[in-house]
Amino acid sequence: MDTKTTEIKGKERYKAGVLKYAQMGYWDGDYVPKDTDVLALFRITPQEGVDPVEAAAAVAGESSTATWTVVWTDRLTACDSYRAKAYRVEPVPGTPGQYFCYVAYDLILFEEGSIANLTASIIGNVFSFKPLKAARLEDMRFPVAYVKTYKGPPTGIVGERERLDKFGKPLLGATTKPKLGLSGKNYGRVVYEGLKGGLDFMKDDENINSQPFMHWRDRFLYVMEAVNLASAQTGEVKGHYLNITAGTMEEMYRRAEFAKSLGSVIVMVDLIIGYTAIQSISEWCRQNDMILHMHRAGHGTYTRQKNHGISFRVIAKWLRLAGVDHLHCGTAVGKLEGDPLTVQGYYNVCREPFNTVDLPRGIFFEQDWADLRKVMPVASGGIHAGQMHQLLSLFGDDVVLQFGGGTIGHPMGIQAGATANRVALEAMVLARNEGRNIDVEGPEILRAAAKWCKPLEAALDTWGNITFNYTSTDTSDFVPTASVAM
């Protein structure tokens, strides 16, 4: 071999040094995304003096194959395929200095069926990148070929309704309060009262695990005694979300097996356990015919601010792939952050077989879920019977409405609080099915029902005027057009 000739060819193909990301091929304004590409929409805030196109190219580069300098080993790979490509940059409406940048990733960059691998690329590095003041992942689109590598929810909405034999209306639940401090026996008493009064589910809260005042095994035993007694007395299938979140997967599996042995139909985990753990426990639930409830504990640390972090609609998409049956998605009218249209977008991501572009609700891409099962959204946090017409109008039937304080704080007791919520729901569903305008007539419908139900009357007298009217920090930004109507 002619060494000299080889060296010359090497120099022609490779030159050491630092190039702009756009020059390295991470920007292509003419690129047309393929059906098999993974697409991501970032909201970026470049540092002063940084060109938005270069910033977008940097996001594409640092979330795929690039590093800060040219490396000769690029020539050992199919660079043109492996490079992510920023293909569109546009100013965020009404927000100077911020830009939407669209990035396409070849499917070959991702391991099949692994949220951990997906997130390591998409959010693993770019959010600390110095040329950006801030960055937020607003939305994603997954090709059908990629969606098919995931198993999705172990039970799904249809399977859960068939198992519970409950159709045509939302499910009702409540979180046991206070979150911490009750003994196992008193905890079970709360669960029994709520279920006996008319709720479908009671639940553990995110931070009740196994503390000195109540060991997890005691809680499970007393809770399932309450569930079985309430089920026998009402003739309805009842349940309680037993939180199996623990410090290790081995301990989580141990708690899940014990819950199953007691006859529980559902277990719960917190988002903070991580995506690998979530996918692992989802697989266990699939194998053991259990419903998996997901509490989104901790999400607000990175989903709430508009300029930096991850939109919850993306988290919802990841969790549908990962395989949860229930997911807390906000209430819009309760105590927690949530613009009504934006929250409806989260629900649509969970429940629809195909998402169309819906800019007012923050959905920027079409998404075909390829027959992946649907996730049941959960509305929880500061809601009460007086808001039943708003909740039913906003979210429809496929939702779990959880009234924690609105059940356990009832002036006539826990069972009365549950009855108030059940009567309010039944009255509102009946009125809706009769063709009445529940948005307008809701308060009147509730008061009419309260004439025959003292617990509902007491609930309306106690909380009827309670609202949480704060401006949402996370709303959708888009340019209104004739085809994008509010």
Swiss-Prot record:
One of its GO terms (biological process) is reductive pentose-phosphate cycle. Mg(2+) binds at residues 203, 205-206. Its EC number is 4.1.1.39. The keyword Magnesium applies. It catalyses: 2 (2R)-3-phosphoglycerate + 2 H(+) = D-ribulose 1,5-bisphosphate + CO2 + H2O; D-ribulose 1,5-bisphosphate + O2 = 2-phosphoglycolate + (2R)-3-phosphoglycerate + 2 H(+). The keyword Magnesium applies. The modification N6-carboxylysine is found at residue 203. Keywords: Calvin cycle, Carbon dioxide fixation, Lyase, Magnesium, Metal-binding, Monooxygenase, Oxidoreductase, Photosynthesis. Its cofactor is Mg(2+). Induction: Expression of this operon predominates when carbon dioxide is limiting. GO terms for molecular function: magnesium ion binding; monooxygenase activity; ribulose-bisphosphate carboxylase activity. Binds 1 Mg(2+) ion per subunit. The basic functional RuBisCO is composed of a large chain homodimer in a 'head-to-tail' conformation. In form I RuBisCO this homodimer is arranged in a barrel-like tetramer with the small subunits forming a tetrameric 'cap' on each end of the 'barrel'. Belongs to the RuBisCO large chain family. Type I subfamily. Heterohexadecamer of 8 large chains and 8 small chains. This is Ribulose bisphosphate carboxylase large chain.
